[in-house]
Amino acid sequence: MAPPLSPVSKLLIGLIRGYQLVISPLLGPHCRFRPTCSQYGIEAIRRFGMLKGSWLTLKRVLKCHPLNPGGEDPVPPKNFDNREH
């Protein structure tokens, strides 16, 4: 079971949902990844919390550009550790 969300995490998820409902339909589908970057952000914040979830989301959004082919890029599992040893 996921830990309870902090108020800031809920706010960030609300902002992403607002983007999904208001801005994204105006821009049309252009995300190169599955799940979309906005859905990835919601999942990452829910899974890892505000700090790490936001960091993963930022890295994902920066990869979403015309030179990247995109494709499947799910949120890493909870035990994911990207630190280099």
Swiss-Prot record:
Family (UniProt): Belongs to the UPF0161 family.
GO cellular component, one term: plasma membrane
Source superkingdom: Bacteria
Name listed for the protein in its UniProt record: Putative membrane protein insertion efficiency factor
Function recorded in the entry: Could be involved in insertion of integral membrane proteins into the membrane.
Entry annotated with the keyword ATP-binding: no
Alphabetical keyword list: Cell inner membrane, Cell membrane, Membrane
Keyword Transcription among UniProt keywords: no
InterPro entries linked: Membr_insert_effic_factor_YidD
Organism: Sodalis glossinidius (strain morsitans)
Pfam families, per the entry: YidD (PF01809)
Locations listed in the record: Cell inner membrane
Membrane topology label: Peripheral membrane protein
